[in-house]
Curated annotation (Swiss-Prot):
A GO-annotated cellular component: membrane
Organism of this sequence: Escherichia coli (strain K12)
Keyword field contains Nucleus: no
Any GO BP annotation: xenobiotic detoxification by transmembrane export across the cell outer membrane
Swiss-Prot/TrEMBL keywords: Cell inner membrane, Cell membrane, Membrane, Transmembrane, Transmembrane helix, Transport
InterPro entries, alphabetized: AcrB_DN_DC_subdom, Acrflvin-R, MdtF-like
Function in brief: Participates in the efflux of aminoglycosides. Confers resistance to a variety of these substances.
UniProt-listed Pfam families: ACR_tran
Protein name: Probable aminoglycoside efflux pump
Compartments it resides in: Cell inner membrane
Gene that produces this protein: acrD
Length: 1037
């Protein structure tokens, strides 16, 4: 094939240009994102039961839904929460790669059979099913800059005019509203009700009947009589619209003609639909929306569409209303991709300089440089064909591929130059001879490197998805690199290189002359050193065994994790006060935290958005969540201005706040997997010991974790048990008094929890009508005695006649995981300790709990455990496939061992570099380690291929090996140094995404340094030992 293109260089150029064109088109078509779709698809079922306690919700709603979620394909785990605010949610997480739409359909089908078992109030509110993740990709704050709108005006406008349009944007899974629209609020006065001998049910019945839209029909509708001359729509009663109209609703007409109207027994006003949240942006009253990504949607594209839609809506905002982006993930993605592109360009420049140093001829250096854009563009075409995206993983793989793809072209050019110098052949003749010599080595290198990465593509789960991005990208680049080296590079060598006279070399003057002298002198020393090693093999075998021991030691000592943490330009702060604390008490703590950020971190902080009433562990008056957005990475100090440094300082400051637990934490490495960095587990009650026993086990576990110095900030990601007022109904007394239990329940719900009655029209939008006791009549336990229920004889019976109340402790938020009662425990490893080690410690601590309690890992920790279990299999399969490819290449079962034995020499360097830099054994490191395995084998192949060929032609084994070492030293050092300098920008990068670049670059760089230094000595030793043990008969030339 090479000879064909040597004679037809224009044909080779045409193919290269076409490859570049297709790649260029692919780049503009490929989506951009931080990661591919790594988070498992989530389907969330949400139900509302106004006024219900968490225990009531769990018993009547949550468990009913859970028990019907059977027979779902690819379900990984299921979690549920029942909140004292009346909301229940069941989240089902499916294996990565599951079609989210199909998952939603299956969940909806199973839900249908559960609907009739749910309370009527829940059915009236509706049960929603959405494919959505757990974390926000955008948090938008809305503020009135001129103060013309109060917080409820802002919230109503946002809920009425912005929330729905944004929820219909393609890619949006769900939207959390930190505020609510207006509703018609009917605040009942129990004393006035009783004075008119009326009950709460009388009020709701009157509203239902008199606030209704009646479909009457038509005047002259078909079928009509002959000669009918008129057809018109008939309107009658319609929905009410104003508080005045509601006040005029007639509750009763007395015999004397007097009336009791709604305004006589209640205060009617426009009020908030929900009073759960209180939001602030940079200290000003605000409302907000949290945008969640639909499963399978592109984060970057969705965020851009949402912001574009907001810009369209903003032109209709009331005067003074503006939106601010309080939290977003796209800036980090853009910045990290830009940084990787910068790294890519730096790598190309460094590789060019290394090649020029060795080749010492601009034309010769230009040839492998031309191969770089051709192969990269071709790789983008392959990514497009596979439906992949431009993301952090594929770009990291591109940087790694830089060093790999120039190797093939370097080997070709270097060998052509050597033949021209030694034999005086023309460039065309030298190229033909060179390709005949090294074509087998090129194919062998491609096979081995492909063999290392191809098995990665077949692993499942989130880790497998990460592996696949690297695998497809690097293998595509490798295959294209070999094709370019056999098609374009020979054609370029034959046409671009200038002929050399026999014995003539480049670089005979100046710096290059000095460099060549030094290199040749060291090459001679190297050859003599190899000869000594071959004569003293036992000593070097002992050294090799010691190196193996060091490798195993480092492997066991290197801490583990899933993905490195990144400075994402934002973080969150959660606030939790003791149970029973009020919204105003929580707000005071929030104001303290705001003051700290704006005072001590003003050089780093762009904005602070706080929502009182919403927390990562649940909703309530005693919790708050704050979104901290930082200034651009370029505006912050690279050491003191990182998010990690800010969080560390904030943690020390917040430890002084005694009235609340304040936790500042980084977002999870992968959006949609957990709520923060660190580990995430569920403590489960397998024995059904009950809530109190589970809480005792939780407290015991947290106490044990607090005593362990390798753990930090281990906490329950939920709400603590709080005082609850239990109302006991004596049903015998109630029945004796003629009071219906349904009437008692309806009155309790209306008075204390609010009842949704029906809807009304407000400025062209349908909104809700709620009936509830006025605030002064539901503040104290004894207020229950103010309420009356009508018995079957028409008499008014007070609650004190059949009801008593008592205090007890209960949870405002109950959790379940995979069908068991559970509590979520989150935490972090102490500085210098990996999350993998922290997870091992937590597992050992759980074993100290009473029997019947166990743990399951969830979110990111689940994936970390999965990746840790897959890593040994990945290494083993890759090494096995490499061995088989080498066996096929050399037609020998023995020769591959001389290549395979070199692999640990690269691995120990990768481990040592990673360990010395304080990094961890994560997925990125594992990918880098596989790269090192392939490159270590590649260097060995360059020597073994030549030595084996000469040995088969009848040359002495010792001389053949030394000759191969002498001939291959320069290309080995050149390709290795090119690769090392190619990944140097990754290992030294700063700014967005530098954590991932360090994780990949450090291990690969360390591995290549050790593999290059050690392998050039050990490869000839292993080849000679293997050949002596398994000699071959020489083949005639």
């Amino acid at each position: 094939m090479a000879n064909f293109f040597i004679d037809r260089p224009i044909f080779a150029w045409v193919l290269a240009i076409l490859l570049c064109l297709t790649g260029t088109l692919a780049i503009f078509s490929l989506p951009v994102e931080q990661y591919p779709d790594l988070a498992p698809p989530n389907v969330r079922v949400t139900a509302n039961y106004p006024g219900a306690s968490a225990q009531t919700l769990e018993n009547t709603v949550t468990q009913v839904i859970e028990q019907n979620m059977t027979g779902l394909d690819n379900l990984m785990y299921m979690s549920s929460q029942s909140s004292g605010t009346g909301q229940a949610s069941v989240t089902l997480s499916f294996k990565a790669g599951t079609d989210p739409d199909e998952a939603v359909q299956q969940v909806q089908n199973q839900l249908q059979s559960a609907m009739r078992k749910l309370p009527q109030a829940v059915q009236n509110q509706g049960v929603t099913v959405r494919k959505t993740g757990d974390t926000n990709i955008l948090t938008i704050a809305f503020v009135s800059t001129d103060g013309s709108m109060d917080k409820q005006d802002i919230a109503d406008y946002v809920a009425s005019n912005i929330q729905d349009p944004l929820s219909r944007v393609n890619g949006v899974g769900d939207i959390d509203a930190y505020g609510s629209q207006y509703s018609m609020r009917i605040w009942l006065d129990p004393a006035k009700l009783n004075s008119f001998q009326m009950t709460a049910k009388d009020v709701t019945d009157a509203i239902e009947s008199q606030n209704a839209q009646i479909a009457v029909g038509q005047l002259g509708g078909t079928p009509s009589v002959d000669k009918q001359a008129l057809n018109a729509t008939i309107n009658a009663q319609s929905l009410l619209q104003t508080p005045e109209q509601f006040r005029d609703i007639t509750l009763r007409v007395n015999q004397d003609g007097s009336e009791v109207r709604l305004g006589d027994v209640a205060t009617v006003e426009m009020g908030a639909e929900k009073y759960d949240y209180l939001s602030r942006f940079n200290g000003k009253p605000a409302s907000g929306l949290g945008v969640k990504l639909a499963s399978g949607a592109n984060e970057m594209a969705t965020a851009e569409l949402v912001l574009n839609r907001l810009d369209e809506l903003a032109q209709y905002f009331p005067h003074g209303l503006e939106y601010k982006v309080a939290y977003e993930t796209t800036s980090f993605v853009k910045a990290s991709i830009e940084d990787v592109v910068k790294t890519l360009l730096e790598a190309i420049a460094l590789v060019f300089l290394v090649m020029y140093l060795f080749l010492q001829n601009f034309r010769a250096t230009l040839i492998p440089t031309i191969a770089v854009p051709v192969v990269l563009m071709g790789t983008f075409s392959v990514l497009y064909a596979f439906g992949y995206s431009v993301n952090t993983l594929t770009m990291f793989a591109m940087v790694l591929a830089i060093g790999l793809l120039v190797d093939d072209a370097i080997v070709v050019v270097e060998n052509v130059e050597r033949i021209m110098s030694e034999e005086g052949l023309t460039p065309r003749e030298a190229t033909r001879k060179s390709m005949g010599q090294i074509q087998g080595a090129l194919v062998g290198i491609a096979m081995v490197l492909s063999a290392v990465f191809v098995p990665m593509a077949f692993f499942g789960g989130t880790t497998g998805a990460i592996y696949r991005q690297f695998s497809i990208t690097i293998v595509a680049a490798m295959v294209l690199s070999v094709l370019v080296a056999m098609i374009l590079t020979p054609a370029l060598c034959a046409t671009l290189l200038k002929p050399l006279k026999k014995g003539e070399h480049h670089g005979q003057k100046g710096f290059f002359a000095w460099f060549n002298q030094m290199f040749n002198r060291n090459a001679e020393r190297y050859e003599k050193g190899v000869a000594k090693i071959l004569h003293r093999s036992l000593r070097w075998i002992v050294i090799y065994v010691l190196l193996l021991g060091g490798m195993v030691f480092l492997f066991l000592r290197l801490p583990t994790s899933f993905l490195p943490l990144e400075d994402r330009g934002m973080f969150t702060t959660s606030v939790q006060l003791p149970s029973g604390s009020t919204q105003q008490q929580t707000l005071k703590v929030v104001e303290q935290i705001e003051k700290y950020y704006f005072t001590h971190e003003k050089d780093n902080i762009m904005s602070v958005f706080a929502t009182v009433g919403s927390g990562p562990g649940g909703n309530g008056q005693n919790v708050a969540r704050m979104f901290i957005r930082l200034k651009d990475w370029s505006e912050r100090d690279s050491k003191t201005g990182t998010s990690f440094a800010i969080i560390e300082r904030a943690t020390k400051a917040f430890n002084q706040i005694k009235e609340a637990r304040v936790i500042a934490s980084s977002p999870p490495a992968i959006s949609g997997l957990g709520s923060s960095a660190g580990f995430d587990m569920e403590l489960q009650d397998h024995a059904g010991a009950g809530h109190d026993a589970l809480m005792a086990a939780r407290n015991q576990l947290l106490a044990l974790a607090a005593e362990n110095p390798e753990l930090t900030r281990v906490r329950h990601n939920g709400l603590d048990d709080s005082p609850q007022l239990q109302i006991d109904i004596d049903q015998r007394k109630a029945q004796a008094l003629g009071v219906a239990i349904d009437d008692i329940n309806d009155t309790l719900q209306t008075a204390w929890g609010s009842s949704y009655v029906n809807d009304f029209m407000d400025r062209g939008r349908v909104k809700k009508v709620y009936v509830q006791a006025a605030a002064p009549y539901r503040m104290l336990p004894d207020d229950i005695n103010l309420w009356y229920v009508r018995n079957k004889d028409g008499g008014m019976v007070p609650f004190s006649a059949f009801a008593t109340s008592r205090w007890e402790t209960g949870s405002p938020r109950l959790e379940r995981y995979n069908g068991y009662s559970a509590v979520e425990i989150v935490g972090e490893a102490a500085p210098g300790v990996s999350t993998g080690t922290a997870m091992d410690i937590m597992e050992s601590l759980v074993k100290q709990l009473p029997n019947g309690f166990g743990l399951e890992w969830t979110a990111m920790s689940y994936q970390e455990r999965l990746s840790g279990a897959q890593a040994p299999a990945l290494y083993a399969i890759s090494l096995l496939v490499v061995f088989l490819c080498l066996a096929a290449l050399y037609e020998s079962w023995s020769v591959p061992f001389s290549v395979m034995l070199v692999v640990p020499l690269g691995v120990i360097g990768a481990l040592l570099a990673t360990w010395m830099r304080g990094l961890e054994n994560d997925v990125y490191f594992q990918v880098g380690l596989l790269t090192v395995i392939g490159l270590s084998a590649k260097n060995a192949i360059l020597i073994v291929e030549f030595a084996n060929e000469m040995n088969q032609k009848g040359h002495d084994l010792f001389e053949a090996t030394l000759h191969a070492c002498r001939q291959r030293l320069r290309p080995i050092l050149m390709t290795s140094l090119a690769f090392i300098f190619g990944v140097l920008p990754m290992a030294t990068s700063t700014g967005a995404g530098s954590g991932g670049q360090h994780a990949v670059g450090t291990g690969v760089m360390g591995g290549m340094i050790s593999a290059t230094i050690l392998a050039i000595y050990f490869v000839p030793l292993f080849f000679v030992l293997v050949r002596r043990r398994f000699p071959l008969k020489p083949r005639p030339e």
